[in-house]
Amino acid sequence: MKGISKILSASIMVMKLGNVYSAVPLCSNTYDPSQQQPSYVLIPSTPEAITNCAYSPKNAYVPSSPTTSSSTPGTNNDNETSPTTEDVGTCKISVVKHCDTPGASSTPCEPEQTIPAQPVTMATVTPAIIASVQTPSVVSVIPVTQKVIQPATMIVPPSSIIPGYYPNGTPAAPGQQGQILSGSVLAPGASSCQLVPGNTPGQMLPGMTPGVSPCLPTQGGDGSNQTIPGIVYPCQPGQGGSGSNQTIPGVISPCQPGQGGSGSNQTIPGIVYPCQPGQGGSGSNQTIPGVISPCQPGQGGSGSNQTIPGIVYPCQPGQNGDGSNQTIPGVISPCQPGQGGNGNGTTGQPGQCVSVPQTPNPIAMPPISGISGNGYPTSTTYTQSLGQLGPCIDVQKPTSSCESQTNEKSTMQYAMEACAAPTPTVVIGNSEYLVGPGMYSSLTSPCNSCCQC
């Protein structure tokens, strides 16, 4: 539709040139987001006017200072509104995104205006915006410097190759010599790691004793792990006999199922690993001070959680009888569906799930007859307060007792247009936001909360 209102401030130009968009929702959408929604909606850029939207102050627009640009609205023969904004004290109105064809766009709609190319500098960025939203800025270009690859500090010539090893890091293969890791050079006279008769020599790292340190898996026959100070590798199933782990101080790796007999974990001070199902008899967790892991279904009899001060894990469905949560002071986990009756979570009584009153939509929506199929009020619902929708309409605002404090003007300018695009958006300053049905409450009286009495 051609006669769509267009109110653009200098900050919106910066937004278009810099392609600054934000997906931060201004208000929580209590309706199905897959429904068709208006392509844009006008709201006031007043912090107090939208603070209570969906009871979510964190989504409120809180500028550091008001924008002072203003101009006078008007219409032409095409029933289009000239680019303008109206400064209403602390309530500066910014608007509006629209679609060329109703329902044809699935991406944020562009303003219906051609803006000539011009350099964008920090001096043009004047509107106050949400602190968490990105603002246009001058980006300094950092020259790309070529990364210099340092050559190897030592190259072992072929004449110096020690039997059993390669200097180039190539893994050993049956019938071939072993390998030296990058940066590692074996001392003269060093030989291969521990061997099992009839097998290929394995790999040894610096600090290991030739002929004593075990080989890597698949090397040395028994598949034991090779260790160096501070590193340990767990045995794989079927390796090293019982499959137990080799450990060094401060490091532990848990046994895998079928290893170490019962499959219990090896623990050292400060570290614990939970048993897997079928390990350790009942499958309960091994715990040490300050650490806990939750039981899995079918473990520990009732499947209850072991808890320590400050930590709690919820029971899984079918555990502990009714599946209620175990709680400790300050922590709660919600019940799962089918638990504790209706399965709703609560921060009320510990150890049981109770129903929570559903928070109604804080916005007083029009009667059902005035709500369109997309969950938004129909345009005719607001005719009484907004006048004819589409072009900008001047509406008289009742005199406020706080007018002397805020310097509010008696006239406001706003407009709304719905073209059934998937996502409604609103432009505030130089950023674009997604909005939900709740934002329509601001249209009925956009500056109700501008005053601080």
Swiss-Prot record:
Keyword hit for Signal: yes
Region (Disordered): 61-87
A GO BP annotation: sporulation resulting in formation of a cellular spore
GO cellular component: polar tube
Record's compositionally biased regions (Low complexity): 63-73
Top-level taxon of the source organism: Eukaryota
Chain intervals with Polar residues compositional bias: 74-87
Region of interest (6 X 20 AA approximate tandem repeats), ranges: 214-333
Sequence repeats: 214-233, 234-253, 254-273, 274-293, 294-313, 314-333
Cellular compartments annotated: Spore polar tube
Function summary: Involved in formation of a polar tube through which the infectious agent is passed on to the host cell.
Name of the protein in question: Polar tube protein 1
UniProt source species: Encephalitozoon hellem
